Amino acid sequence: LEAEISNKPGHPINLIYAKPNNQEIEETLDHIKKAQKPILVVGGELQFSKKSKVLIKEIAKKFSLPVLCTYEHQDLIDNDSIYYAGELGLRPPEPIKQNALQADLVICIGHQMNGVPNMGYTFPSDTQKFIHVLPEKNFFNKLFKTDVSIISKGENFLNKLNNTDYISNKNTDWVNECHNRYMNNKATLDIREAEDGLDFGALIDELGKQVPEDSIITNDAGNFTSWMHHRFPFKSKMKLIGSEIGAMGMGI
């Protein structure tokens, strides 16, 4: 079919990404200073930013913040980093739940906190202070009440927060506690001799030793992926590609 139209082709547009203002950064710093057990939750749109991976590492160290990655985003920080506190994935182990629920301040950047990471709408809880950073406002105060809502691209927020003068190491014990829980839980997942073949835990452990640090890892949906989620030692130079909605066949 053909038809005459009067509209002219559009021109390329420059995308404008939201940034936090000074007051929002000061509010965030104020909450960090008051918190005894703050935790950083990262995921969602941060997956598209290599710079964000660097900033997450720097922010965690600068403010002594344990880092929880949302489902399918464990590649945002080195999993052997002392700041890594685990993944908010499907049926997270009890120690990872404790890392999330024992925090008194939750700073979530890039993820809407819908679906898997909220652990059945129990996280963040009403007793936790919640700072939510998203590039648009439609998801603020929809599922959870936010104490500070910041409209900003995640990378822009991380960059501005990292450029502040405040540095804190008062949460070192909390950082160690969270990472030790993650490591101790991982150590309990013993390799077993399988009568009908190979224990997939052994396979994942060997992959973790052999794959290059800049690998692209793709995974599908299903219970078998739990081996990867619980055992694979992701590096921030890697790229993890997988579906958050559990659709079969995405790994292919």
Model region roles, listed by residue range:
Residues 2-15, 78-79, 180-191, 236-238:
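Gly-rich Lys/Arg/Thr-decorated short loops/hinges at beta-loop-alpha junctions or inter-strand turns
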Residues 36-50, 60, 218:
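Glycine-rich phosphate/diphosphate-binding loops and the adjacent beta-loop-alpha structural elements
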Residues 1-34:
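Conformationally flexible catalytic loops at phosphate/diphosphate-handling active centers
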Residues 179-251:
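Active-site diphosphate/adenylate-binding microenvironment
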Residues 24-39, 59, 100-103, 206-215:
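Glycine-rich phosphate/diphosphate-binding loops that line cofactor/substrate pockets in enzymes
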Residues 44-46, 72-74, 111-114, 222-224:
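Short glycine-rich anion-binding loops that position phosphate/pyrophosphate groups of nucleotides
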Residues 73-178:
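Glycine-rich, acidic loop regions that bind phosphate or pyrophosphate groups
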